[in-house]
């Protein structure tokens, strides 16, 4: 799904592929089935060098998530519905993670004042546009969360718990109360609460690491396995997975990596905390996938 050589998005694709190489090794993009441009330019080598220790620390955890046996367990429509009824909460809290980054890097208050660096503001706002108001089909603009709800309906999955949860949150209930009122599966509750705990601590570099490594770097490899095994009668889910493979491998991962570097700078302690947050995020994802496998039998 690479972009043409003369497309202005090519710089982002080059950066994203180099980012994945830095995290997982030089052959990783090819092994993941991601687009690899024939000539690598615009490489930010000093930034990638600083990612070296983080790369070594997270590589095994990334691989465990990317190659998880869960996708092979989704062998029936009922199993696929169970997966979606668990996974939708990761789709929802992805947006909370993203919006927390936007709040940390841009001014969302009135009256407005400049906050952060112009480049960081642009980076986060570009990602928010794509996730919160994507063009998912001609004439249709929606968030990826709303798209996922349509995919669940198409597949016959139960959307009432997630709708109840969102309604409770909108009404002002505490997150753990909303999760309980909605009857959210315990493993999905654990996943959401781990994300919200990280957000509430409020360390920008840790939040960005969870977003960059735990989500943006992991999603393309995870979803490639899913797309390959999907039945033909769930086209919206297939489109959702393919859209994330496209934007997260070609665009968003590179943008997120630049933000992570900006947050950590040359501070060794921040890089250490970022590494811990990334690993914790990947471990939470693995536990969620383990729970899906256990549920579908």
Show which residues each predicted segment covers.
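N-terminal amphipathic/basic-hydrophobic helices that include classical n-h-c signal peptides
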Residues: 1-37
